[in-house]
Amino acid sequence: MNHEQSRALYDRALSVLSGGVNSSVRATRPYPFFVEKGDGGHVIDADGNRYIDFVMGYGPLLLGHSLPEQVQSAIQQHAAEGPMYGAPTEVEVELAEFVTRHVPSVEMLRFVNSGTEATVSAVRLARGYTGRDKIVVMQSGYHGAQESTLVEGEGDHTAPSSPGIPESFAEHTLTVPFNDEEAAHEVFEEHGDDIAAVLTEPILGNYGIVHPVEGYHDTLRQLCDDHGSLLIFDEVITGFRVGGLQCAQGAFDIDPDITTFGKIVGGGFPVGAIGGKSEIIEQFTPAGDVFQSGTFSGHPVTMAAGLETLRYAAEHDVYGHVNDLGERLRAGLQDILEDQAPEYTVVGRDSMFKVIFTRDGPDSLEGQCEAGCQQQESCPRFEYCPKTGHDVTQAETERWERLFWPAMKDQGVFLTANQFESQFICDAHTGEDIENALEAYKEAI
């Protein structure tokens, strides 16, 4: 593939953008390709190269790049009527009504502008509602670029994971390994009266798609109930992707107190949202005392894009299509790995997928989960399938990024930039895309 135009654009970008990009995950090695346009389930770069796109904007594009007419029309109509007003509009009410009808735990919402802003506001809300300061998060979990959760360490021995964050922020953040019920019990035994909330993704979507073991979320729910703490589900990635319109919490039959949304709920435009029980969400100003505000919150173009995307998904069996393709892709990947790299692990659920370059596996794969690790104890891979973020870091992450990612790109498949970020299937993908992707995986692996 020729990449002369992308190389030239990257050189220009380096002189005016920090690192040449506006998000660190876009800085692929040796340099990123620059996208000219999207086309259905594909992207075309500045040099005219076409790729099957499994990045999908890192999750927001449930329908792909070629939007259905009803979505395009709604976006164009609201843009033509004026970009924004600094006043409420009907479409933000309609989108909130749609979400509250379909997500059982959500009675009320507050829209914001990004997943990070949603989790920042959710943490502030939990602290304000409970009158407590400490937050429990999962080791290696990611909840956006916010000071309260950019921490590393174990238990209450934590420190900021980035320069520029005061040590005092980490003092109020407690970390536990995902899927470790004993650690969850221990942190509540020691700090239960001070814990405002547990903040977790239903599935670790930013750290290798780590699926919960059976009963783990029930344990978190019970611990929060016993100690008067709130359970916050970060569904920025899984929301309206895993579990369809009921989201991952519906798939796992868990009712969190607060849910954060992003990505799909904005239909490809900048968005975030905090939802939950009315009693809690009404603590936001102006109804309550927990300050929250934003110039672009509830932006009418974003609200229209999100509403029509979700309506289209509900009316056209989008979830049936993308989930079927996801299962076919993961099953095909397992067949390839069984032959070429049996120690590697296929992970994912519904329209999410990834191959983790784990270093060990069982002697026999007979009876393994059919389409990716689901943390089933009867599966021969159960002891080897990553259960925490730490497990994923122990895989061959450098080989994945340095060798595997470029090999897939050279075969026309666009994957997320490292072993940690999830990959996604959209409604515009086809069976042919899946077959071509499997051939590329077979060659690259």
Curated annotation (Swiss-Prot):
Gene Ontology MF terms in the entry: glutamate-1-semialdehyde 2,1-aminomutase activity; pyridoxal phosphate binding; transaminase activity
Gene Ontology BP annotations: protoporphyrinogen IX biosynthetic process
Keyword Isomerase on entry: yes
Family annotation (Gene3D superfamilies): Aspartate Aminotransferase, domain 1, Type I PLP-dependent aspartate aminotransferase-like (Major domain)
Top EC class of this enzyme: isomerase
Catalytic activity: (S)-4-amino-5-oxopentanoate = 5-aminolevulinate
Chain ranges passing through the membrane: none
Listed SUPFAM superfamilies: PLP-dependent transferases
Pathway the protein takes part in: Porphyrin-containing compound metabolism; protoporphyrin-IX biosynthesis; 5-aminolevulinate from L-glutamyl-tRNA(Glu): step 2/2
Residues bearing the modification N6-(pyridoxal phosphate)lysine: 263
Keywords annotated in UniProt: Cytoplasm, Isomerase, Porphyrin biosynthesis, Pyridoxal phosphate
Location in or out of the cell: Cytoplasm
GO CC term, one of those recorded: cytoplasm
Predominant subcellular localization, coarse grouping: cytoplasm
EC number: 5.4.3.8
Required cofactor(s): pyridoxal 5'-phosphate
UniProt record similarity statement: Belongs to the class-III pyridoxal-phosphate-dependent aminotransferase family. HemL subfamily.
HAMAP family xref list: HemL_aminotrans_3 (MF_00375)
NCBIfam families: PRK00062.1
Identification of the protein by name: Glutamate-1-semialdehyde 2,1-aminomutase
